[in-house]
């Protein structure tokens, strides 16, 4: 009997339901409950937040299934979990556990340096990172139902997420005015599937939601990414590495929803403690940048 896989329409529809919301990284049931109470639309269960993964070095793998299960039992909102790029078995284990989404993530150490997962062969929907339209189209071609900027995880520095969001949007704007012959050439230039680029042209935008991720540390950061066209926001280290996680979580949710209410955002920010300590992207070598993982 052939394996039943979810259709693109169903998977993308599930991701569309998270639009306009905040998805928070959590490492235990207690943090998951804080995220849910703050208004998160989903949580990402993992063993360590990106800043701790960066600090520890070594090989970062998918979370212990026990942690994922504890988070799933603690909240009623969707639960995501990360698998290494190309690690079929990590992803299959998470699918068997019943997680709502899998993030094929560059935050973890890649398991395969040539191939990403064939996400269209899974029932569970996948989210993947991208820095440009080529990466976005390749991931969609493999079956990703949701995208996010890669940014530079664990830095508390929004600059790379801004760069990636602007890059994708500008390349989509360039694509939508092309004719079919030009799209064929552009597909070759980007190393992207022609059919996916044609789909993007016909939609006038990416056919899946594209969230901001990688460096969101303050309510202002979250609002900025929404202003730039993000469909929602992932927050990794920014909440639970802050002085007051509960307040930061609620403030980031509010700022994401009301991203053009600058008076409210200012009020929210003024009532918070210290944000997580940030890293200057220029002090991180190319070899140490998580965004460079994947192809």
Curated annotation (Swiss-Prot):
**Recorded metabolic or biological pathway in which this protein acts:** Cofactor biosynthesis; pyridoxal 5'-phosphate biosynthesis
Q: Its gene?
A: pdxS
Per UniProt, where does D-glyceraldehyde 3-phosphate bind? 166
The Swiss-Prot or TrEMBL record describes its family as follows:
Belongs to the PdxS/SNZ family.
UniProt keyword list: Lyase, Pyridoxal phosphate, Schiff base
Record's Pfam families? SOR_SNZ
Keyword Lyase included in the entry's annotation: yes
EC number(s) stated in the UniProt entry for this protein: 4.3.3.6
What is the protein name given in its UniProt record? Pyridoxal 5'-phosphate synthase subunit PdxS
| Self-association state and partner proteins as the record states | In the presence of PdxT, forms a dodecamer of heterodimers.
The first-level EC class reads lyase
UniProt lineage:
Bacteria, Bacillati, Bacillota, Bacilli, Bacillales
Please tell me the species this chain comes from.
Answer: Staphylococcus haemolyticus (strain JCSC1435)
Q: Which residues bind D-ribose 5-phosphate?
A: 25, 154, 215, 236-237
Q: Name one GO molecular function term.
A: pyridoxal 5'-phosphate synthase (glutamine hydrolysing) activity
Catalytic activity entry: aldehydo-D-ribose 5-phosphate + D-glyceraldehyde 3-phosphate + L-glutamine = pyridoxal 5'-phosphate + L-glutamate + phosphate + 3 H2O + H(+)
What CDD domains does the entry give?
pdxS
Give the PROSITE patterns listed for this entry.
PDXS_SNZ_1 (PS01235), PDXS_SNZ_2 (PS51129)
Q: Which InterPro entries match?
A: Aldolase_TIM, PdxS/SNZ, PdxS/SNZ_N, RibuloseP-bd_barrel
């Amino acid at each position: 009997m052939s394996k039943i896989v979810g259709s693109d329409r169903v998977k993308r529809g599930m991701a569309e339901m998270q639009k306009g919301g905040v998805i928070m990284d959590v490492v235990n049931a207690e943090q998951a409950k804080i995220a849910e109470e703050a208004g998160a639309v989903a949580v990402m269960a993992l063993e360590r937040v990106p800043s701790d993964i960066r600090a520890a070095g070594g090989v970062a793998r998918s979370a212990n299934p026990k942690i994922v299960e504890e988070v799933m039992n603690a909240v009623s909102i969707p639960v995501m979990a990360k698998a290494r790029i190309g690690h079929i078995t990590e992803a299959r284990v998470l699918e068997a556990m019943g997680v709502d989404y899998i993030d094929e993530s560059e935050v973890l150490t890649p398991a395969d340096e040539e191939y990403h997962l064939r996400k269209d062969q899974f029932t569970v929907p996948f989210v993947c990172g991208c820095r440009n339209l080529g990466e976005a189209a390749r991931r969609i071609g493999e079956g990703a139902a949701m995208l996010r900027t890669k940014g530079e995880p664990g830095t508390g520095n929004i600059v790379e997420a801004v760069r990636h969001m602007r890059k994708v949007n500008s390349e989509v704007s360039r694509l939508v005015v092309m004719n079919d012959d030009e799209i064929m050439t552009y597909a070759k230039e980007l190393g992207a599937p022609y059919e996916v680029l044609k789909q993007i042209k016909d939609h006038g935008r990416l056919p899946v939601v594209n969230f901001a991720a990688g460096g969101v540390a303050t309510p202002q950061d979250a609002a900025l990414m929404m202003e730039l066209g993000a469909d929602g926001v992932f927050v990794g280290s920014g909440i639970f590495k802050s002085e007051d996680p509960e307040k930061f979580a609620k403030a980031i949710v509010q700022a994401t929803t009301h991203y053009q209410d600058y008076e409210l955002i200012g009020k929210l920010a003024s009532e918070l403690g210290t944000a997580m300590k940030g890293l200057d992207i220029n002090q991180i070598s190319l070899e140490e940048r998580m965004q460079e993982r994947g192809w």
